[in-house]
Amino acid sequence: MCIRDSSFLVQDQQGQRFEAILKSFDRNSLLFTPQKPVAIPPASSLRIEILQALPKQKALDFILQKTTELGVSRLDVFCGMHSPKTFRASEKQHHLKRWQRIVSEASKQCGRQFAPEIHFHPDISAALETLPECPNSWVLVPEEADAVSWKKISSSGDDIIKHHRVLIGPEGGFHQDEIKLSLRSGMHPVYLGPRILRSETAAMSAVSILQFLWGDL
């Protein structure tokens, strides 16, 4: 419930935030008076990019919202070979607008000045060809063999890594051809433990771990 003369925060299209006083409201509008500007929390010094195979809509909404809150810089969505559904090229703009609205709302809720970038690709091959080079690129794999450990890398004493890209599969996991293609493109396999994670859990866990080891958590 809105209470007249109560204060709240507003954010404009340039990302500036202000304290405001509510004067009146009805079903379709609010009238408020801007007061003093409010400091914006600094952006994360760690650039994290998520390359996400398309999961179910509810799971993707969760991924977009929570990774935005955790400070992800860019989200690239593609139709995976095991994705539960795909959509036609003509539907691309409709979905992008919806996704952009979700990350915009999440950014305002958590105090971010700007929302992350969002892009869509028809398949993993197109995504890998389009993305700029990132030496610290990872693909989440279900088995520990040949996989690297972020914890071991972070404790090795090497320079602080400030740019990561993580490839995450849908609910059905990756097709073997997708894993092979990602490894040929220069990605490194990484293992998040013995438990089977949902796609949305894997995305949120990966971003949280990276922020804890190299970012601002």
PLM feature spans:
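Structured adenosyl-cofactor binding patch, chiefly the S-adenosyl-L-methionine
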Residues: 176-217
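Short, hinge-like loop/turn segments at secondary-structure boundaries
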Residues: 93-96, 156, 208-209
